[in-house]
From Swiss-Prot:
Its main location: endoplasmic reticulum. The gene is FKBP14. Monomer. Homodimer. Interacts with type III, type IV and type X collagens. Residues 135-170, 179-211 form the EF-hand domain. GO terms for cellular component: endoplasmic reticulum lumen. Disulfide bonds join C38-C96. GO terms for molecular function: calcium ion binding; peptidyl-prolyl cis-trans isomerase activity. The lineage of its organism: Eukaryota, Metazoa, Chordata, Craniata, Vertebrata. The keyword Cell wall biogenesis/degradation does not apply. Glycans are attached at N176. This is Peptidyl-prolyl cis-trans isomerase FKBP14. Residues 45-135 form the PPIase FKBP-type domain.
Length: 211
């Protein structure tokens, strides 16, 4: 019995030691351009309007560009909720409008073992990202009262979806129903702690503070 316990403890120790020796994957960030004045820096839950170019590190080939492949239009996305790549959520925090960053994203924070489209499995990716605008996102504390249309101190899926549509339309972005539905479901999956179909003010604020 003692031998069994000793082996179990030893196995746990070795496993923990190996885990500690293996570094967590990180995004390499290079600031290419920065404004002289920065009134606001990005944080989790913010809506970001960006232009970007994505390249494969192995051969430098371009796999996507908003300038070329998106009718020349920048894109909106919400930071910190895995709406984009994990590498974006990690590498675009604390960014200012007018700032341009180069991100080198390892496979674990990109498309991993599966790859996607023109991107082979286990690809390291390079992105040049230009931040054009920051807005309060659907998960920001400041937006709660604006989203709570009936003032009942809780948010329904319809209220969150209506807010998203209004924000996207305000800035000339194309309203994509399936995109909004998926984003709302993701928000409720993370925010609706008691799974009652609503996000209370307490749930909203508590989750936002963790971002």
């Amino acid at each position: 019995m003692r031998l069994f316990l000793w082996n179990a403890v030893l196995t746990l120790f070795v496993t923990s030691l190996i885990g500690a020796l293996i570094p967590e994957p990180e995004v390499k960030i290079e600031v290419l351009q920065k404004p002289f004045i920065c009134h606001r820096k990005t944080k989790g839950g913010d809506l970001m309007l960006v232009h970007y170019e994505g390249y494969l590190e192995k051969d430098g080939s371009l796999f996507h560009s908003t300038h070329k492949h998106n009718n020349g239009q920048p894109i909106w996305f919400t930071l910190g909720i895995l709406e984009a790549l994990k590498g974006w959520d990690q590498g675009l925090k604390g960014m200012c409008v007018g700032e341009k960053r180069k991100l080198i994203i390892p496979p674990a924070l990109g498309y991993g073992k599966e790859g996607k489209g023109k991107i082979p499995p286990e690809s390291t990716l390079i992105f040049n990202i230009d931040l054009l605008e920051i807005r309060n996102g659907p998960r920001s504390h400041e937006s709660f009262q604006e989203m709570d249309l009936n003032d009942d101190w809780k948010l329904s899926k319809d209220e969150v979806k209506a807010y998203l549509k209004k924000e996207f339309e305000k800035h000339g972005a194309v309203v994509n129903e399936s995109h909004h539905d998926a984003l709302v479901e993701d928000i409720f999956d993370k925010e609706d702690e008691d799974k009652d179909g609503f996000i209370s003010a307490r749930e909203f604020t508590y989750k936002h503070d963790e971002l």
